[in-house]
Amino acid sequence: MRPAPAWTERVDADTRVSPARENVRWGIYDILNDHQVSVEEETSYFRTVRKVLSPSGVQNAAELALDFDPSFEQLVLHDVTIVRGAIRVDALAPDDIRVIEKEDDAENRIYDGERTALIFLKDVRPGDVIDYSWSIEGANPLLGGRYTDEYDLSSGVPAARIRHRLLWPEGHPLQWRGANPKVENGAYVWEARDVPPLDVEDGIPTWFEPWRSVQVTEFTSWAEVAQWADAMFVLDARSQNEVRALAEQFRATHQSRDAQITAAIRFVQDDIRYLGIEMGRNSHEPHQPWETLEARWGDCKDKTLLLVVLLRELGVTAYPALVSTRLQHRLAEKLPSPFLFDHVIAQVIDGGRTYWVDGTISDQGGTLATIDTPGDGSALIVRATTTALTKIAATSHASMHVEQTYTARDYTQPTQLEVRTTYTGWNADEMRASLASMSLDDYADERINALAIDQPKIEADGLPVIRDDRTRNVLVVTEKYRIRELWKDGHWSWYPRVLESHLTRPNTMIRKMPLAFAHPLHVQQTVAFHLAEEADVEKTSSVTESPAFRYQSSVDSNGRTVTVRQSLRSRRGDIAAKDVADHLTKLNAIWSEIGFRLAPAGAQPVVTASATSAQWGLGAFVVAMFVGLCVLLARKKAPEPAAVTTVAFAPGEAPVSALTVARAEEIDAHLATRACSCGARTYTNADLQRARYAERDLTIVTRHCGACGREQSVYFTAA
């Protein structure tokens, strides 16, 4: 603890300010956020003056968290003062400071050694102002004395003033982008006043930056960044020898060159586990391959360097490539800086073609020529001769095709269900990795519980059967089930769960920011119903298209089989804010027809003699699209023409028509007015469940009629 550096400026802050209620978030208001940098002193100074306006503000503001990297930085505290009216209280007590390991990325198996100093302030009250300042001394030695950073001019809480002051050595080149500075007393100053709180809409693409910022950098070109990186990826003699010996093993065990390349890729991906020890120099510099081989772990840098050197020993041209999984195609809009990159992959050139290989993807299938290319936009090739970014041409063989076949020999015995799911490309990679992380029994339990959402009385007929052709990267899972009482109510409703998970709506529908959409995506779901009677259903088909996707749906019949086919293919990964309304309209159109109700005439509900068996007529079969679309009614072939009618889901009858309620009492009121189809209004055995459907939380009340025993489910959602 010591006073602020002499080169800093003390900025006035009016602690008597009384912000309007609409200018407060989380119970706090920032009067000043000040940041000053001296490049020659390798020191950054920070000061925050924050007003606490409510008990929740006390909770949010009374614990200070200051981050630093002890491998090359030193945290220096200057002062912590609580201002209460005209009274200023020194609140900096050494006994109230705790230093803990930060490790924000521990769940991703990345450990960078950063620390957080926590200061627990005592006796903070609403109306107080907390004024605290600190400095970080030291610069990352890997940058070789060069400076690059990005300054925020936005904030999550409202701020009266945000200020950045940069003392820059005379004669050194400096580039900036985002806002022009003022020059005050030989320093560059960027400032924003009366800054509203930043509202980030949900579902934005990773590349979209909603905040205002200024990028500053001493790097003058991408060539300079590439040369900096090239110096990091230097091989020592021990690594060269050990990798050469490893390459000889692959040559001895695999005859063809393609097989050797595939073996090398899979060795790095599968046999070297992903773990990032990114402390000190290894925040940017990879470990030597011999270290990676000895530890059998590594992060993206370590794995890529090992893979590149191994491929070179096998006679393949390969280079490390820096990419930004966040900025993607927007990387080219930034000024050159090493800090823009968050991942490293390998550029592989073979037979005149360029491929991109990610060494961190375990269980990946395919060969060099067929593996999916990550869509990271642009890459900086780590090579001394690199002068510009290289565009990555993304390729995808990914698809998922779910085929569900229901066979009902009659409507009293259990219905047979076979589910066959075919995964290709990165969908196969993901499924292969998922299966590798669990037992077959666990996977079987996961699957049957997913299917039980729509078919509660489902039983497995053995364990799932998995066939994996890793070379072609095609993985097929086959499941068999029996479903009891599927037709108990005389009909059954079906939802394409796989498709609907990709058709969610954002919470913020009136948008100022773009909306992300899963891409690349190709999902198909085919459902065939083999029934106990003829089902001459009218053939229908529909297509819904938007800039982001193409959706197709069709209904067909052949003898006793009804087939529903649906597919969704993405076209791009984002929707501009101005196009979101049209996108949501298209989604609503799909939701209006995405599910089906089946009511074959032979599957009558279990009711008393007042029987509704003539409801559809002998041999009638109905496929009804949700939300009151036209119903395709077909009869067994007979002289009279098929009738056409309309069936709508009554309020509360299905998830899509869930009743909106504000209080629990309203649920009771709705239930009291709802009669069974037999006319009775007495029920027993009520059961309450919670579920989530189409981004909505549902309450489902299931009960049985006291007269006929028929089950009734009523769906509610909160207002």
Give the label of every model feature segment.
Residues 1-628:
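A sensor for short, sequence-defined functional sites
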Residues 2, 207, 636-638, 652:
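Compositionally biased, intrinsically disordered/low-complexity regions enriched for serine, proline
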Residues 31, 617, 631-632, 658, ...:
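Acidic/proline-rich low-complexity IDRs
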Residues 256, 419, 634-636, 702:
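Short, intrinsically disordered low-complexity segments
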Residues 303, 620-627, 633, 679-681, ...:
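General secretory precursor processing signal
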Residues 628-642:
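C-terminal membrane-anchoring or membrane-association module
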Residues 639-719:
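Cysteine-centric segments in proteins
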